[in-house]
UniProtKB/Swiss-Prot annotation:
Residues 720-1023 form the Piwi domain. Residues 1-83, 125-220, 527-548 are annotated as: Disordered. The keyword Oxidoreductase does not apply. Pfam families: ArgoL1, ArgoN, PAZ, Piwi. Residues 1-13, 125-134, 527-545 have a biased composition (Basic and acidic residues). This is Protein argonaute 3. Residues 411-521 form the PAZ domain. Belongs to the argonaute family. Ago subfamily. The lineage of its organism: Eukaryota, Viridiplantae, Streptophyta, Embryophyta, Tracheophyta. Probably involved in the RNA silencing pathway. May bind to short RNAs such as microRNAs (miRNAs) or short interfering RNAs (siRNAs), and represses the translation of mRNAs which are complementary to them. GO terms for molecular function: RNA binding; RNA endonuclease activity. GO terms for biological process: regulatory ncRNA-mediated gene silencing. Residues 14-30, 37-54, 62-83 have a biased composition (Gly residues).
Amino acid sequence: MAGRGGRDPRRGYDGGYGYPRGGGGQGGTNRGRDGQRGGGRNGPRGGRFPGGRGVEPRRGGDVLGGGQGGGRGTTAGAGGLVRGGSELAVGAELRRRVPTCHVNDFPELGIGGTPVLVRRWRPRDHRDQHDHQSQRHHHRHHHHQRQRHHHHHQRQQRRGSRTRDPRVRRGPLRIPYGEDEKEEPPATPIASSNKNKREEPPTKHRPMARPPGGGGPLSKGEVKLLVNHFSVDYPKESTFFHYEIRIKLGDGPNRKLSKAELLTVKNELFEHESLQELSSAVAYDGERNLYTCAELPEDCIVPVSKFRVKDSSRTYIVSVKLKKPLPLSQLLEQRPGPRDVMQGLDVIVREASSFGKIVLGQGFYPQSGSEAISDSNIVALKGTQQSLKCTQKGLILCVDYSVLPCWKAGSVLDLVKTMKFMEYPLLEDQLKKLNNALKGLCVTVSHRKTEEKYTVKGLTDKPADQITFKDSKSGQTTKLIEYYKETYKKEIEHPMLPCLDLSKSKSKQNYVPIEFCNIPEGERYPVARLDDKKSDNKGEQEKPSTKTTLRKISIKVASSRKEEILDLVGNAQDGPCRGKIAQRFRISLDAAMMEVTGRILAPPTLELGTGTSRGQTFKFTIHQDDCQWNWKLKKYDKRVVAHGGTLNCWGVVDFSEGDLESKFIDKVVRKCSALGMVMTRKPCYEHVSNMEVLSDPKSLRDALIEAKRAAEEEDKKLQLLFCPMLNRCHGYKTLKLMCETELGIQTQCFLSTAAKLDEKRQDQYITNLALKINGKIGGSNMQLDPDSIPVVSAKDFMFIGADVNHPPPGNVSKDIPSIAAVVASVDKGASKYVTRIRAQYHRCEMIQNLGDICKELIGAYEKVNKKKPDSIIYFRDGVSDGQFDMVLNEELADMENKIMVGDYPKITVIVAKKRHHTRLFPKDRNQRQTKNGNVLPGTVVDTDVVDPTAYDFYLCSHKGEVGTSRPTHYYSLLDEHGFASDDLQKLVYNLCFVFARCTKPVSLATPVYYADLAAYRGRLYYEGMMMLQPAASAASASEAMMPAAQPQAAAAAAAAASPSSSAASSSEGMTASQPQAPAAEAASSSAGAADFRELPPMHGDLLNNMFFL
């Protein structure tokens, strides 16, 4: 590639580079139009000619053109890297300094590599004044060449004496190119007098280490705590042995073996007389890894052996080989311990804890601990959730009390009988209900000798006695009933019932009669299917719902939960790390919980309105231990929202069929006015409807359009609709979809039963509705005082929260997308947020095109504040420890590349984790605690039970009303602001106080909480879209979900996005960029790209509102 001319007045540069497999080519002297390269040819394996000199000035700017570029390519993919990139061109405003680097620094550019990103320094304008003024008037080539060599020497001198801020990140340099931005590959410097000096290759971001010192001065007291972490004792001088075991079929088609088959073969192997003594000294992970406490005899293990399993006609080929010894002394020498040693210990502890238990993920449930739920097909398994960790105090096992709803083990036919579906023929509604109940269920079959599990895809359209198929051997059409009779000697006793579809592929159907299918022990029951309805049989006492019964079993107050955990750990028979395996490996568990010292952070100062004049604020600090406050007026103050929104036109569509008390809406309106909102007293539209209209998309759309039309006839714009409902309904999803994406109307839904609450509870309910309404119409309920925002309050700061909502567990279809949501604050009080939602690939955790999303959010911030933020605190939710690298080196890198303009903002990255099982308990009754025995809000732990090297802490920011409080586990992955431990913990805690819907701190920092709500709103949009197309065939639906492919990647796919989380939430900007499929995903996808439907764009009127509240 020939040398490029300078690209724009600010970041022009001369010198060119060759792309991999490109090469210098014969450079041209053409004008570098808008930064395009000069003419010339590209050699197929590096150019044969050096790049020419771009002597023409770039059109449109006082920038001199390319200079010497390209270079003589000598190897494939290396052409064009000899000269160029280190050269500088002078821009009209600002010259960008580019560090030099060598070709040898980037071995990945050998053949067909991708351009490598170079390091960057922050630009320093004052150093460029002389260069700028001295070069801008020289346009002839020989003057430009002399200037370049002169300033290159000056640059080298300055660079040698320049000191770097150690907190400055290294990352890719982005240079604007017209409307778009492209990356600058590295280039080799011109020969220097000091050949040994060169830049290091770019390094990846790593999670930051814990800074020296700790928190303390800002806390209001200490508290003694117990943590459900139990110390693990292991033989520190011993060595375990890691073996690789491979098992495959010796005859028949080669297929992936199930875990049950692998475990059976492994057990059979150690029944061999020479290995029998070691059968209790082996831990197996169910795949390829085997761990032993002693080395296996060499004369007993051969590289490959064949044998048959008892009661099976199949032959298996097994190979076992030593991978490496694992000295446990390494756990003392390295913190955290080496990954392979920790993985081995984890497998050993799991194996030592699983005897006689049903193991599901990290859950261990003794079969003796099940509790049947009356009048249902569900049982509750009581057990533990366990995870092995390395902490500052050493190796520990985190053990938590757990209850798992499971199907009652037995025949699927018994399940059908309890549903009273044994009559023939099944009605359409019965067939649909049975299909929904069984779809996704894992079953075993009784007509064949196998323990393999099959997933139910659905039911057949016809009963068993009407199903026929073509025999692949004879080519004749055979009845299913006759096939089972002849092949398996089985009579089908219920031919009127449909069969279960257990097919693993569309090409090979597998229909099995219901009576030959069984539900195994420990088959998880989907929580989403739990019944909320209570028994309403006349003459019988009202029975609690299944969900209510399970909640009573699973939710324990702190003291009861602590006792349950201690009982489970101390159980000699069913406790963790028990039995022969634990004895042979000499691993044991301390029966006492670990004791730590926590600190209680002081609550922040909040700002409210005074109700006297706009802009005047009232500051107050919460003094109650539970950190709750209210809006009740006192003689000496008047508490109103910090900024009241304006609601000029609102209406009511009553889906409760007039069941709502007539004065309830009026009470809401008066409460809104009392809290400082500007709201008209009378609605501009009222209509009484019913739940049938809400459930029918066509009728619902007509009702909503009529409401909007009625407002327009009065020359008003409908802003909000109150929508009372009799009960929760799926029509809620289509209501939100239509109003927020088609019509641009905010909605406030609530149950009509709220009007029947007692006066005190009703007033609280109405207040919460008013707070939600104010947030939706652009108001601000409460704000943080600047003194409560450490370090960044004096700057233009932005808080960003991001989360991804995935399809629920057990979902069979891979066409269902994951929903990503990103929110960002736009005010100094950290209370107003804007949102962007995107749909992306199924179960893809990395947020696609995060940089483009953040660019939009910064644009919204700039629109409000007339300037861009110079400090960003990025909160990320829902990622595991193993995905920290993805957050830092993919999401963060994408963000930096897109938002970097001049001096990019400083960034701090914080991950919030709620899906863990660490619990904090007051040591005794003398410790400060809530009324129900939970730790107080603001309790933070950052010693002993935290990561030995990472910068993390546990923060319990909320008052646990029910059960045991779960602290949030925060990790600081990157900190360019230099927060002290106290400052960072205080910032996170204080952000929990500005959640718009309540007057108490929430369990999660507000930016993350909002992202969670917004992502969940996107999930509702998607489900609402699917409800609007019930008649679409599978083929047409699949075709509709296929986005257009990107021209540069066969597997690239279009994507819009959407939110993720837990309550009503929503977002905007879903029409933006379309992400490109990850390479690995594209290669493995049989469908081509990504199978998901784009979400509709958010209506422009709601684009920057907090509609998700």
